[in-house]
Structure formats: structure tokens, C-alpha cells
Amino acid sequence: MADKYILAIDEGTTSTRTIIFDHAGNKMADAQREFPQYFPKPGWVEHNANEIWNAVLSTIANAFIESGIKPNQISGIGITNQRETTVIWDKKTGLPIYNAVVWQSRQTAEIAEQLVKDGYGDMIHQKTGLVTDAYFSATKIRWILDHVDGAQARAERGELLFGTIDTWLMWKLTDGDVHVTDYSNASRTMLYNIHKLEWDKEILALLNIPASMLPEVKPNSTIYGKTKDYHFYGSEVPISGMAGDQQAALFGQLAFEPGMVKNTYGTGAFTVMNTGEKPQLSDNNLLTTIGYGINGKVYYALEGSIFVAGSAIQWLRDGMKLFKKASESEAAAVASQNDNEVYVVPAFTGLGAPYWDPNARGSVFGITRGTTREDFIKATLQSLAYQSRDVIDTMKKDSGIDIPSIRVDGGASNNDYLMQFQSDILGIEIDRASDLETTALGAAFLAGLAVGFWKDLEDLKKEYKPGKVFKPKMSTDEREDLYTGWQEAVAATRQFKHRPRQSK
């Protein structure tokens, strides 16, 4: 395997990356390219699917140029992606009929709210494991079909295809030969029955979405198809692994046993627990989702999605201009001299799990004349840890499983202050991955298993490289006192409902 490699495409919310891994899981190349974000109206977030495709092609080329590795040295390709983001395109031309509607976008909130008002929320939860929310793909499909002239009729004639970003990239790489998704991405559409492992006819009928639009659903580690040689520099390479970003990170963290938990601190923060081979429906607003399907078995997960994590640090940098580099936030937090009396609730786009309150807005509590820039930065960092505790406590309640430690990754987990505070406020060990790119590594592992690059899960476990471990230093009394303050801050935030009149 010395001259063979696995290539992973990691298509995120703000940028695309291509990473090439060797057999030991080492990065041999890492190419990244950002692409534009579109905000047509307040609360709307869209992407141009062709710009994403061009970014993918660009990063593949740059990864080969940077490393000197040849396309014919790639044994398999893994794809991981921002989940829920919805693309609808013309089957013949391959052209999207509208921008991709991004997972963060709230433009379909009215559709989701109407489903709940009409009493369908519980049925949808029982079948899909999800709460009824604009976050997921189903309402986005309905919205596009409603807002593009003639789209519903074209869909009913079988002229249109739907896909999340994994499906779109697979279709493009194979030049339209393969229209598939995987268990993990399908389970985030709000259209997939996670018990029967099939698209749910009742929900499709409810939303008037033609089944002909939908991709075939396959396991996460299998050969789906091959690249067209003209898209991959003369080589036809198997595309053999696929998973939504958070499930890929779970796999990349080698969390193969029930009860193992990972937390990824990206734009949002996503806590995922492997719950084994039976779906465990949450009574407390967590999402039940498919972790991955491999070797003829399907493994389920509980997930808590926090909408604002790393983006809160970006807000401090770009919106508030409190520092120039995100890395400066750590030194500021350490320099803060206050007693943690300031709380920032970063509900910029509502609150995610376990509250699912789309109407909440960001707030700050506990400031005095003596509050400093450093105090404000520290409180914002702490909000990431408090939100994660909200989810972890709920996860314990739902699963009945004690959580002795958490494996963490993602950009904000680089912040030692945040990771120590996370350990303190949870009272458990935090294990930070040595390589924070576990999402791409998970996609690579899935792809490599399908083509024999790695033999089995035991073979993968040999590649685990522990990073830094953070252990709690805070007393139980202090921990619970601080967390009580956070709970009060969230409750007060949710009470504030006033919105100024829109100027015409």
C-alpha cells in the first residue's frame, strides 16, 4: 500500500477540502477553497451548487499538485458533506433549477410550523427520528417546488432529481450515471423511515414530493460507482465511502461501541452518541439518526445539534471586531479576571437542541460597568461549553448510559481554554483528537474499507492517535452554580419576544 492512497472530499458549509491520506491515516495533501454564501433575505442562506462543484474540482487538482501523487495512485474516494442542504436539478441538463437551500436557512420555517400545527409532528418524529423543523431537507424540497415556475409538474413527469450535497457530487463525478445517497444523509431529510430503511410514502404524500426525484439509499461503505476519466485526470477511481459530516466524524473518531460520544466544534457544534443497532427515540428533543451502515448492519445514533459554536467566535472577530484572529480569543479568556458572572446566549438563529426554539435571539446577562472585552470574549467561549452540557445531560437522560469521556474535534476544539472549561462544566474527561480533521478521515476510512485498503474495524483502531486530554479541575459546587446561571440566562432569553416593526 506504500504507493496507494485514499482521497476524501470534505464539502463543508463555507469551504470545500480535498485531503489525501496514506495507510497510517496521515495527511499527504490538504487543499481548501472557500465558496460564496448568498443571503437573499434575512434568515435565508443559499449556495450555488455549480460553484460547489467547481470548488471540488479545484481542490482535487490542487491536492495532486501539492503532493505529487498521481490520480492512478488513489484506491478509493470518500465523500463527506454538509447535511440537509438541498439541491434540485434537471435530469437531462444537469443544471440546478434553484440555488441550494442550506441547512441553516430558515426560509422554509412556515412549512415546518404548519406541519406541526396540523398535528403531523409526532408521526414524523416516530418515523424519521427527527423534530419537524426547517433544518431538514423535506421542507426545502417543498419550498423549491413551490417557488420555481413549473417545478412541481416537471418533478411529477420525472424530469427533476433531488439530492443532498453527497448525491449531487456523486452524480457530477460519475457524469449522471449514479443517483444515490447513503443511510446517514437519507436519515437527515425528514423523508426517510429509519426503522424500515426506506423512503416513507406517507410523508412523501403529505408533502406532495414525487418519489421519482429521490436517490437510491445505500450503505456507507460500498462501491457506488467510478469517476469518469475526464473528471479525474484520466483515471476511473471507485467512489466507495459516503457519510454526512457528523456521522463521518463519529466514524473518524473510531466511536464504534454503543455509548461512545464525539463532539465536533465547527460552525455549529454537533454531539453524537453511538447507540448501537436499535434506534432510540428521544423524549427530550434530541435527534435519532443513522450513524452508519456497514457490513450488513445499521448503527444508530443520538444527536444534539447546536446552531452556533465556531460562528460565535467569528462574530466576535468579524461583527464585534474584538480581535483579528480567532486564535486570540484564548489569550483574552485566560486574561479575564471576573468570576464568570457574564453569560452570552448566542441564539443568533434560534436555539437548537434540546430547546428547538427558532424564535429565540441572542442575549447577554450579568454585565456591569466593570465588564471588560476579555470578560465578554470568555463568556462567549463558555457559551459553547454550556450548550454542549445541555445536550450531554439530555443524552444521558434519553439513553440511560453514563458518559465517562468525550472525543472532540473541529476547529474550535483547538482552543485549550474552551476545552478545559468544557471538561470542568461537564465534570468528565475531554479527549482531543491529534488530527482535528476527523470528518475527512471518517470518509476515507469508509472508502478504504470498501476497496480493501484497510481490512476491518480492528485494522482501523490501530490508526487511532490520541491527542491532548483535559481533566476536570472545578469543584462540583462551582460547576453546578455556574450551570444554574446558564439555565436562567437561557430561560430569560426565550421569554424575550419583541421584534421591531420592519421598515418598508
From Swiss-Prot:
Positions contributing to glycerol binding: R83, E84, Y135, D245, Q246
Residues where ATP binds: T13, T14, S15, T267, G310, Q314, G411
PROSITE patterns cross-referenced by the UniProt entry: FGGY_KINASES_1, FGGY_KINASES_2
GO cellular component: cytosol
Catalytic activity, as annotated: glycerol + ATP = sn-glycerol 3-phosphate + ADP + H(+)
GO BP: glycerol catabolic process; glycerol metabolic process; glycerol-3-phosphate metabolic process
Entry similarity comment: Belongs to the FGGY kinase family.
Name used for this protein in its record: Glycerol kinase
Naturally occurring in which organism (per UniProt): Pediococcus pentosaceus (strain ATCC 25745 / CCUG 21536 / LMG 10740 / 183-1w)
Gene: glpK
